[in-house]
Structures are given as structure tokens and as C-alpha cells.
Amino acid sequence: MNYFDLPKIDLHCHLDGSVRPQTIIDLADEQNLTLPSRDINVIKEMMVAPETCPNLDEYLKRFELPGMVMQTAEALERISFELFEDAANENVKYLEVRFGPLLHQVKGLSLDDIMDSVVRGMKRAEAQYDIHGNYILSILRTMPKDQIKAVLEAGAKHLNDGIVAFDLAGSEVPGFCHEFVPYAQYAKELGYRITIHAGEQGAGQNVYDAISLLGAERVGHGIFIHNHPEAYQLVKGEEVALETCPSSNVQTKAVNSLSEHPIKAFYKDGIAVTINTDNRTVSNTTMTDEVRKVVEAFELTEAEYFDIYTISVNNAFTSDAVKQHLLSFAQ
């Protein structure tokens, strides 16, 4: 299999974890910000997580530099465009990018400007390359909840025209879903699809709650259903897709090694698994890398790869017309 040439779909990719290191330097210059270094190798080292981190919080430290420069409309549009450009250049045909709008208000940028900027960057890339995309609004579980409705209302202007879904992300504690029931309900009332980060850090119960309490149609990571039979059966029975991110899961110690990742066992048992990057820069990866790692580690056939590709298409938060286009690559 030529992994680069294969059509690919990435349903779980974070904007601020996928910024080009050179872009950090360029934007810091434009914004008169002082970086710890102007050496691209030093900047890259600060942005890329080690192959294994002691925990998820250590991994999340790599987002500090992007957060510094992602405070203007121009920066957000550029970073959005470049992410879709990078993905298109390795034959990613459809990309869903998630980002936390509330993280980009340090300098007073309005929610409307933030939404407009990322969607504009994406649409510019769609016009130039053979790629389709959408944005997912991520709310960090640790942030104050009083602004969640405002985020959802601002995003609604682009609903199904660049923005499609609501997500909860960040550090995962047991039982977090109970606090967010009214917000997920409001998102659904407005027309958002729902995907929730859950079961990334040991609590299979969180996956059960994400589906049963929040109405998650997909789950980010979800790998700890392997030690929670009720969550496992719910995911399988409801055909909830898991957005697995193999390299990231090894880095954050969700699994000890790729060979121990449950993706193959899940797939063989009929669970809807998808292959994704999580963070292209922080995990120092591409979709080509992720597909290669999974196919080689678990000896998947080309037919099995295209089956997983088709699962990704069927679970994408996009129109039937785009899905038909994406399925044409699997013929």
C-alpha cells in the first residue's frame, strides 16, 4: 500500500495542536511578540510532545506557544488555511478541525470574528485544493460555563456551512458529563452534532455518560471502554464511532505502546473505529503516518483500510453530497 496516495479522512484534529512552527515565528514577528527563541528547531521542540509523556497534562503544555499568537483574526485565518493545505497535500479528502473559541479572546477578539476567521481560512483552502472540511466547537471542561451558550450562538451563524458540532475537551475527570447536560441539550436544539472527548484517560464510565447523558454521536478517543462492559456494549449497540488517535494515545500513556492499542480488537468486533491525528504538530504526525502505523502494526489489508475509511465517511458531520464524493475515492 502506498500510504501517501491513499485517500484519507481525519475527524479528530485540533487547530492549535497543528500549527506550523515557522508560522509561530512569522506571527510573533508581525504581532511584536517576544518568543523564547527564533530558532525554528527550538520552537519545534517546544511544540512537539515527547514520544511518551507522564500524563495528558504534560502533553497539553505544548499548546502554549500557539495560544500566544492565535489572538488575531489574521492569525486564525492563516493557521486555518495552512492546516487544510497541509492535510490536502497528503491526500486528506475531508478534515474536521476542532478548536476552542474562548481561547482566542485574550486581546478582545469577538466570538463572531473568531468564527468568521477560521471558516474563511478553511473555505480558501477548499477553493484551492481537493479537500472538504468543517469546524467543531470545543469547550474546555475546566473553563467557566457561563460563556458556553454565547459560543454556541455565535457559531450558529455558520451552522452546516463551516461549523457543524459541539465538543468537550481538555483534562478528563470522572463524571464530568453530568455538569454539561443543559449545554449539550442547547447545542442539539440549535442544530449542532455532538462529539465528546471521553475515555481517553481511564474512565470508561465517561463514554457511557457522554452517549447516554449528552447524546454523543461520536466519541473522541473512547479507548477505555475496553474495561467498562456497559460502555462497550452501548458504543457497539448504538453504533457510536470512536475517533481513535494512535500516536497521541501512546504519547499520553492512554496505552503503553501501539501494539497494545485496542483499535484492531474494536474493529474486529464490529465497533465503528476511525483513524485520526489529534494534533499534527504536538504529536509530530500526519494522516499518512497514522494510517501507516495502524496498517503495519495490525497487518490490515487494503480492503480493511477502505472499510475504516468508509466508516469515517459515514460518521462525518457533513452533507450527503460530500459523503457521496468521499465514497467515490473508495471504489
Swiss-Prot record:
Record-annotated membrane-spanning stretches: none
Cofactor or coenzyme needed: Zn(2+)
Residues reported to bind Zn(2+): 12, 14, 197, 278
Organism: Vibrio vulnificus (strain CMCP6)
PANTHER family, per the entry: ADENOSINE DEAMINASE
GO molecular function, one term: zinc ion binding
Superkingdom of the organism of origin: Bacteria
Family: Belongs to the metallo-dependent hydrolases superfamily. Adenosine and AMP deaminases family. Adenosine deaminase subfamily.
Binding site for substrate: 14, 16, 170
Enzyme class: hydrolase
Cellular compartments per GO CC: cytosol
Key word Metal-binding present: yes
Site feature Important for catalytic activity, where: 221
Function text: Catalyzes the hydrolytic deamination of adenosine and 2-deoxyadenosine.
Keyword Disulfide bond: no
Name by which UniProt lists this protein: Adenosine deaminase
Bound cofactor: record note: Binds 1 zinc ion per subunit.
CDD domains: ADA (cd01320)
EC number: 3.5.4.4
Keywords on record: Hydrolase, Metal-binding, Nucleotide metabolism, Zinc
GO annotation (BP), single: purine ribonucleoside monophosphate biosynthetic process
